[in-house]
Swiss-Prot record:
Organism from which the protein derives: Burkholderia vietnamiensis (strain G4 / LMG 22486)
GO MF assignments: nuclease activity
Cross-referenced InterPro entries: RNaseH-like_sf, YqgF, YqgF/RNaseH-like_dom, YqgF/RNaseH-like_dom_sf
One record GO biological process: rRNA 5'-end processing
Gene3D superfamilies assigned: YqgF/RNase H-like domain
CDD domains from the UniProt entry: YqgF (cd16964)
Enzyme Commission code: 3.1.-.-
Protein name, UniProt field: Putative pre-16S rRNA nuclease
Keyword terms: Cytoplasm, Hydrolase, Nuclease, Ribosome biogenesis
Parts forming coiled coils: none
Amino acid sequence: MSGASARDATFLAFDYGEKRIGVALGNALTRSARALVVIPNLNREHRFKAVGELLAEWRPDALVVGLPMHPDGTPHDMTQQAKRFGNQLNGRFGLPVTWVDERYSSVEAEAGLRERNVRGRARTDMLDAEAARVILQQYFDELSDHEHH
């Protein structure tokens, strides 16, 4: 992607987890991201069928996958699984994948939902999609930082 197309690109972002995958949608032009949906991570077939449906509906130009790390930046158990998920997305759907350090995305997502008074089951249901939104917003913020230097 280059020029105007890169600036107006649509992105889907994923917060990969063993039980659930949070998904967010965003646009590079507006630099805004919103929580979209949570996919139950039941098995590979279900996971990629659900992702395929989202890709058909939203037609993103690129994908962003959160890469879980320990606070000191070292990989942990989920790092390799998230990396594999991103590689599979790229292989199956032919879209470019960018990884974003998601060290504090869940903490930030939880705080954001609390600020908006989202409670109980609704908060639990939305948390992974909100974490994906945080990941995508972080990606857009990093793009902005690079453009201003």
